[in-house]
């Protein structure tokens, strides 16, 4: 997944899917 080949694509995807990005952030750093 994180091959580091095209981070720009991942960044764009995250930007398009803000919800997914938030979910990932919550998974890594849950606001509890």
From Swiss-Prot:
Broad class of enzyme this protein falls into: oxidoreductase
Places the protein is found: Periplasm
Statement: the UniProt record of this protein carries the keyword Nuclease: no
Keyword check for Iron-sulfur: yes
TM region positions: none
Reaction catalysis annotation: 2 Fe(III)-[cytochrome c3] + H2 = 2 Fe(II)-[cytochrome c3] + 2 H(+)
EC number of this enzyme: 1.12.2.1
Superkingdom classification of source: Bacteria
Binding-site residues, [4Fe-4S] cluster: 17, 20
Primary location class: periplasm
MF terms in GO: 3 iron, 4 sulfur cluster binding; 4 iron, 4 sulfur cluster binding; cytochrome-c3 hydrogenase activity; metal ion binding
Keyword set, alphabetical order: 3Fe-4S, 4Fe-4S, Iron, Iron-sulfur, Metal-binding, Oxidoreductase, Periplasm
A GO term from the CC aspect: periplasmic space
Co-factor remark: Binds 1 [3Fe-4S] cluster. Binds 2 [4Fe-4S] clusters.
Cofactor(s) essential for the protein: [3Fe-4S] cluster; [4Fe-4S] cluster
Subunit structure: Heterodimer of a large and a small subunit.
Family: Belongs to the [NiFe]/[NiFeSe] hydrogenase small subunit family.
Name of the protein this chain belongs to: Periplasmic [NiFe] hydrogenase small subunit
Organism field: Desulfovibrio multispirans
